[in-house]
Amino acid sequence: MQFLPIKSYSNIVEGNALKLNWEEIVPKEKLSYIIGNPPFVGHSIQNEQQKKEIRSIYVDENGKEYNLAGKIDYVAGWYFKAASLISNTNIKVAFVSTNSICQGEQVVGVWQPLYKRFGVNIDFAYQTFKWGSEAKDKAAVHCVIVGFSTNHNNEKKQLFSSTDKLDLVDNINPYLLSGKTIFVESVKTPICPVSPMYFGSKPTDGGYFFLTPEEKQVIVRKEPQSEKYIRKVLGAQEYINNVERYCLWLVGITPSELKSSPMIYERVKKVREFRLASKAESTRKFADRPTEFKQNAQPNKPYLIVPRVSSENRRYVPIGYIDPEVIATDATQIIPNATLYEFGVITSNVHMAWMRTVAGRLKSDYRYSSTIVYNTFPWPKITEEQKEYISKTAQGILDARALESESSLADLYNDVIMPVELRKAHQANDIAVMKAYGMIKKVNGKDKLMSETETISKLFEMYEELTSKK
C-alpha cells in the first residue's frame, strides 16, 4: 500500500474507537479498506471500563449480550465494529491482533457472531508470530494478522504460516487453518462415552499448605507424628520437571492431633486468616474448614494427570499415571478411571493435533482444558481387537519412559534429546490410533498416514456429525 506511512492529507480523530460512531468520521461509501493495530489487552487483564465497552459492543440484533462477551480480548471490539460497518459492502478489513482470538473458547466468542450476524469471510491470514519490538521492557506478545470482508467470492484465500510459507486455499476458518468453518464449543461433559476429566484439587490457601523438601524435613524431625499428613504434591511444573514438593493433606485429622502439632497448627491458622481476608464470599465461608483444600478432587485409585500448560516445543503433552497417594493440584487435569486405551488415544498425535488446533494458549504454550479440548474430542468407533492393540502400544510408552526413570518428562519430551525407544513407542501408538480412526490414504497404490491438516479435517467432520445429533 503506497499511501503508508501517512505523510500528508491525514485526518486524525482522537477518541475511544469503541465509543465513536465510525460512519460519522468517514462514510462507508468512501472506504475501500480498514486497517489497524488495536490495543493488545487479554480478557483476564481488562479493567472494568474495557470489560464494559466489550460487553456493550458484542450484542445481538436485539441488544442482548452474547454469551462469551465477557471472555474475549479487547481487540475483538474492533472486529465487531468493523464487521458491522462493512456488512453488505466491498470494504476489506485487516487487523494485527492477539493470537488468542483464534484459539480455544475465544474462537466461538469472537468469531461466531461475526459469521452468523454479519456474514464475514476471512480473505487472508498470517498465523501466529512473535511480535518484535525494540523497547527495552518489551512484552512477549504473540500475534496474528487477519484480513476479512463480507464479499463472498470463489477466489483462493491466502494463508501465511509463521515460516512465511504461502498457501492458496479454498477457505480459511477462524482457527486460521485451511478447511471448513467449524466452531468447537466448550461443553461440561465428553461428547463421546469416555472417562470424565476433572480439575485437580484446589487449595486456596495462600501457599500455607505447601512445603519444600527442607520444610518437610524440619516438621518431621520436630513433630514426627505429623508425617502421615504430609503428601507429595504435583502441579504442572512439578510433574513435568520432576520437582520435589509436598503439601499438608489433613483429611481425617482430629483436633487433638492438630493441637499436638504446633507447626502444622500455625499453618492451618494462617490458611484460615487468608480465607477470611478474601473478597470472594465462597472462600470466606471455607475459612471454617481450614484443614481442607477448598476443592478436593483426589482419587483413591491410580489416575491420569494432564498438565494444564505445556510448552509448544513438545510434540506430545506429557501425560501419565500417578499413584493416588500423590496429590494433584488444579494446575493439572485428572482422569480418575482412565484405561490404557484412553491413555493411548489422548497421548497420540491425533489428539495432539486436536489440542494444537482448539486449545487456548498462554503466550505460545498450550493450555489444555477439559471443556474445550478433551470433552469436545471425537473418539473413534473401534473393535475390541483395536482397543486391545492400542492398550499395548500405550503400555509401550510407559515402558519406554521407565527405561529413563531418572530423567524428567521435560527432558524426555525435548524433541532434540528424546530417547529413541520412547520416540519409537509413540510412533507405534500413533500408527495404531490413526488406523483405528481410518486415517489411512492410498498414495501410488500404497497405504500412507494422513497429514496433520487432513487429520484435523477428518476430526472436524466427526465433531460436526457428533454434535449435530445432540
Feature map (PLM): residue ranges:
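Short coil/turn segments at secondary-structure boundaries
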Residues: 70, 159, 244-249, 278-289, ...
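Non-catalytic DNA-recognition/assembly elements of restriction-modification systems
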Residues: 120, 263-271, 286-287, 376-470
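Short mixed-charge
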Residues: 1-8
